[in-house]
A protein has these predicted regions:
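GST-like fold's C-terminal all-alpha helical module
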Residues: 78, 87-90, 94, 98-196
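C-terminal helix/juxtamembrane-tail motif
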Residues: 2, 185, 190-210
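Conserved beta-strand positions that form and line the central face of beta-propeller blades
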Residues: 60, 67, 147, 196-199
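GST-like domain detector, emphasizing the conserved glutathione-binding G-site
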Residues: 1-119, 126
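Short, contiguous strand/loop micro-motifs
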Residues: 7-9, 174-175, 199
Length: 210
């Protein structure tokens, strides 16, 4: 890959949505730079530059002189580019189905109001009580020897789940995964230990900060 094909990911020093893109770029071993921006720097020097920051928010992915915005659009762009969306339309549907369900949890946790913390934890618990069985069903129906969601290989669904969901739940100390969701914990631990995401966790994962 030539220098003009290098990716630059602009994001804050947190996991959140940016961690999925970091994990994805790490997994495909892309030539990329993890450009961490302080919030005040973003507001003063980046937010109002429409040619750079179309919607006034991060993450932004720079590639070949173009600035890509909106995290899910970036994730799908990279997923398609690196053949992580399945081998046919049915597999792509299954992966997109899972991605949409993963997105459902994001509003439950992305609340900065400290007074709502206990309510937030209960919402997250309810979500996983409903969805844990569904997620594990996908893995079992895949019939592979590993914990993959589709096509018995690593796909965008695995990267999303292994990066964002792990970091999200790891930041919620009030939820004891091993006691409350033991099977889901095994699945998450598999993603953390698997070589596919090893570089992400060693270099780019931000411990206990969602």
């Amino acid at each position: 890959m030539s220098l003009d094909e290098k990716y630059i990911l602009y994001y804050f020093d947190v996991n959140a949505r940016g961690c999925i893109i970091r994990a994805l770029l790490s997994y495909v071993k892309a030539n990329w730079e993890n450009k961490v921006i302080e919030y005040n720097d973003f507001v003063q020097n980046y937010k109002h530059k429409k040619e750079f920051c179309e919607y006034g928010q991060l993450p932004i992915l720079e590639y070949k002189g173009k600035y890509y915005s909106q995290s899910m659009a970036i994730i799908l762009f990279l997923g398609k580019k690196y053949n992580l969306m399945g081998d046919n339309e049915d597999e792509e549907y299954e992966i997109n189905n899972l991605l949409c369900s993963f997105e459902d949890i994001f509003p439950l946790i992305h609340d900065q109001n400290q007074e709502k913390k206990s309510a937030k934890y209960e919402k997250v618990r309810r979500y996983f009580k409903i969805y844990e069985e569904k997620y594990l069903k996908h893995v079992k129906e895949n019939k592979g020897k590993k914990y993959y969601f589709a096509n018995d290989k690593f796909t965008l669904a695995d990267i999303y789940f292994g990066a964002l969901i792990y970091s999200m739940l790891n930041s919620l100390k009030e939820i004891e995964m091993e006691k409350e969701f033991p099977e889901l914990k095994k699945l998450l631990d598999f993603y953390k230990s698997d070589n596919a995401l090893k570089e992400f966790y060693e270099k780019y994962y931000i411990n206990s900060i969602f």
